[in-house]
C-alpha cells in the first residue's frame, strides 16, 4: 500500500478513536490523562504509582497528535502528556489557545530507522525518507536529516522548516511527510523513516537500531522537552501537579529507561520554568508568520 493510501486509512482510525474518547464518563474523582503511547510499560507503572498516592487515573488513548490538545480544550480530558514544548507552542499560536505546561518529563531523541540497515549510505541508496507531517516534528526531522548530511536546507536558521525549504538539488534523499503514526508502518515496507519513540513499540523497533538521531542532551534540544500540559484555569491544580512527581518516581523512571533502552533524558523543570521557554518559542513562531 502506498504511503498516501496508508495516511488516508489512518484518518478513519483516528476519527474513530476520538469519538470513543469523547464518549467517556464524567466521574469527578477520576483524572483523565491523554496520551498517544498508552501501551508502553511506563503508563501502567505510572497508573499504579498514582493510585498508591490516592490518585485515580483513566488513560485516554489517541492515535494522532492533533487530538489530545483539542480534547483538553473541550474538557474531554484533564491533562495530557504526549508533546514537547515546540509542539505545544505551535498549537497555541495557530489555534489561539493558551494551554499550559505544569511540569517537565523528559527529552526523547527523534531518530531515523531503516529496516535491516545501519548505515547512512543505505538510506542514500533508498532515496526516500518518511517523516512526521505535523509542523514541529517535521521541522525537527528535517534538521536532524540535514545534520546527518542527507539533505540540505535553504535556510538552516528556520525554527520549523518544511519540505519546501529543502534544497532538492543539493540533497541526497527526498522526504515524504506522513502522519506521525504512519511512519512506523512505512518502516517494515522498506522505507527509511523518522519515527518518534512513542511509536517504536508499535513496530517492535529497537530504539538503539537508529541509523541517525538528534542529541537530546544538547542545549538546542530545550524546545523538545516533553511535559504534562493542562488548561490555564487548572495549572495550579495540586492533584495534577502530583502527577509530575509520580512520573519522576524511581519505578516510573526505571520503566521509561527499559522502554527507551536508556535513550531518553529525564528533565526536572516546573511549570514556571517551562512557561518561560514556551513563551520564547511562541514569540519566534509569531515572528516567522
Residue ranges of predicted features:
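C-terminal motif of bacterial Sec signal peptides marking the signal peptidase cleavage site
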Residues: 18-22
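Short, well-ordered beta-strand elements
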Residues: 28-38, 55-61, 127-129
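Beta->alpha turn/N-cap motifs
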Residues: 64-65, 75-89, 106, 179-180, ...
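A conserved helix-loop-strand patch within extracytoplasmic ligand-binding domains
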Residues: 102-152
